[in-house]
Amino acid sequence: MKTLLLTLVVMTIVCLDLGYTLTCYMNPSGTMVCKEHETMCYRLIVWTFQYHVLYLKGCSSSCPGGNNCACCSTDLCNN
């Protein structure tokens, strides 16, 4: 009986997602699953010398800040 109970507990732990992982958009396209310590998605707008706009997207452990950067903390929020 103890073996059966232990087996059920182990299977429950294995099948459950015990940690939440954030998903963000990344460059050039697609998505990425952030590392455990990366709790924010960011989108940074960079103006090139030819006045083209470049969007840098990804995961971060903190918001880089600045007027050209937007940060958020929910899945796929940095579109």
Curated annotation (Swiss-Prot):
GO CC aspect terms: extracellular region
Molecular function terms from GO: toxin activity
Gene3D superfamilies from the UniProt entry: CD59
Secretion signal, residue range per the UniProt entry: 1-23
Tree of life domain: Eukaryota
Keyword annotations of the record: Disulfide bond, Secreted, Signal, Toxin
Tissue expression notes: Expressed by the venom gland.
Disulfide bonds: C24-C41, C34-C59, C63-C71, C72-C77
Secreted among keywords: yes
Record has Transmembrane helix as a keyword: no
Family to which this protein belongs: Belongs to the three-finger toxin family. Short-chain subfamily.
Record-given protein name: Toxin 3FTx-Oxy5
